[in-house]
């Protein structure tokens, strides 16, 4: 059985010509046998190994990070060190995954969430299920810190997942009086409406940190901020990838674009941004009592 298919807790059926999403709790035990990976050692990213990890990610991914930008993203002050995992085969790095702690708003309720990124596996170790193994390990660590949800985005829809929400993502400034935080449970029925947007909630300190002009190209339109990460592609072409949006007012609608969109470095005006593809956002929930049951997928 496909890994993600076993994590799905959605059913989809067609009524008249419309597809209706019905979410129901249907936990399935992991189909990944963790004992298969006992030869590997789990480590964590720090100032002592960050240079070697950056070299590994650059070698085995499509993008090229300088060490300062990579450290700024990974060793941020908001995430727990246990969310940044390195997998070793003896002393050799074979895989990495990074989880950035964020807050999201869905249906006027705030939840802590792990935003997964830098999932990288050495080419010689692929097709062994290692990426699923370290995803499980990351979410176990998150669960132990009281975080129930994870999220990731991809340019390609995962065919084996029965149902998925495609959501535009934005940033809004935190307002504790307007929204309530709930980190104990997550009502899966909130995802039944596909047109519900996802909002990242940032406080002043987080906005100051993530909208950093040293590492990002910032565009401001109608008091709305768009933050593009300065980065290089393997063909040496400079790119800016949209990683954050701070939507301050509703006049931005015609300019709204999904996170992870690519802007080529020669463009300076927002309407000239070229979208690479639609972004599929996947939210998954740790809905179990026994950690061995792993992740249940929405």
From Swiss-Prot:
Query: Which organism was this protein described from?
Result: Melanoplus sanguinipes entomopoxvirus
Whether RNA-binding counts among this entry's keywords is no
Arranged from A to Z, the UniProt key words for this protein are: Acyltransferase, Transferase
EC category: transferase
User: Which GO MF terms are attached to this record?
Assistant: glycylpeptide N-tetradecanoyltransferase activity
**EC number(s) recorded for this UniProt protein:** 2.3.1.97
Protein name in UniProt:
Putative glycylpeptide N-tetradecanoyltransferase
| Swiss-Prot/TrEMBL catalytic activity | N-terminal glycyl-[protein] + tetradecanoyl-CoA = N-tetradecanoylglycyl-[protein] + CoA + H(+)
Q: Which domain of life is it from?
A: Viruses
Q: What does this protein do?
A: Adds a myristoyl group to the N-terminal glycine residue of certain proteins.
Q: Which family does it belong to?
A: Belongs to the NMT family.
**A Pfam family matched in the record:** NMT
Q: Is this entry keyworded Isomerase?
A: no
Query: Could you tell me which SUPFAM superfamilies the record lists for this protein?
Result: Acyl-CoA N-acyltransferases (Nat)
